[in-house]
């Protein structure tokens, strides 16, 4: 089990996608695999070459799970915890549809959109 509150770096996840003749079903979040209390769920759409970020919440910091529903992005995550050994370290991830990223609350986050249409879900 991944306990999000204990993470000290981002983690890329490959989600399980079940496909058949009708289409597909993707397990985005399973509580038995990831211990995570989220306060909201939002979707973001971005066209090709859009850059978003670097975002973080200072007063009400929160962990995030980012899931790519459609498209491809280059995701950048930066450690902003000043007393951390890895303060300022940048992590880069290329995420495609069906992949997710867990981002600890002490990290800023941004991405560039690579596909014509990109749809992301945040928890």
Placement of each model-derived feature along the sequence:
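Conserved metal-binding segment of the jelly-roll/cupin
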Residues: 94-115
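N-terminal secretory/targeting leader peptides
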Residues: 120-123
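Non-catalytic, conserved peripheral segments adjacent to functional cores
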Residues: 1-95, 116-118
